[in-house]
Design a protein with these regions (language model features):
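N-terminal intrinsically disordered, low-complexity, charge/repeat-rich segments that act as generic
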Residues: 2-41
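Glycine-rich active-site loops that engage anionic ligands at enzyme catalytic sites
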Residues: 27, 37-169
Length: 169
């Protein structure tokens, strides 16, 4: 058995516990990455995210200009007022301490927002929300490629990158 973060994976015929996952699709470039939920670390926040992904959700990305290899995405706000809360998980992170492949979820004003960390960040501030998932090891290289594509869309093309986030199968 191999342990990676708080998750275990199948090795040489052993069986891993059932792990729910999310898929982040990038239709513009025909790519996607899968991330396993960290339900043991952030059970409440993972459950909120899972519930909000009953239907696939379109989101618009934005990439920081100078602080590192991370991008965030926001869904369209709801048409009607929603009950809002703090939306912070059990664990606190600085941008500099989110693990490679970390997916952060923050519940604010309806669906909230996701961030994907595909490399190091230099911003020494606390993130909003908490890490709820981690990109599977086999998709880390794809995560770096899609991160660069989000950067290119924003910085070079000046066109938004739209993603679709859904429950994994």
């Amino acid at each position: 058995m191999i342990y990676w973060g708080s998750m275990s994976y199948v090795v040489a015929g052993t069986v891993s516990p059932m792990v729910r996952s999310i898929v982040i699709e990038f239709p513009k470039i025909g790519s996607s990455v899968r991330a396993d939920l960290w339900e043991d670390m952030e059970p409440e926040l993972c459950e909120v995210l899972w519930g909000n992904l009953e239907n696939p959700t379109k989101m618009v990305c934005r990439h920081p200009v100078s602080s590192g290899q991370e991008f965030s995405a926001e869904a369209r706000p709801p048409r009607h007022p929603v009950k809002s809360g703090l939306g912070v998980g059990r664990n606190r992170y600085l941008y500099t301490t989110v693990p490679l492949g970390g997916v952060v979820y923050a519940v604010t004003g309806g669906f909230g927002g996701l961030s994907l960390y595909y490399g190091p960040c230099t911003e020494p501030l606390q993130i909003r929300g908490s890490v709820v998932a981690r990109v599977i090891p086999g998709d880390l290289e794809k995560a770096a490629k899609v991160g660069r594509a989000v950067w290119d869309a924003q910085a070079l093309e000046h066109k938004p990158m739209v993603i679709v986030v859904r429950r994994g199968e």
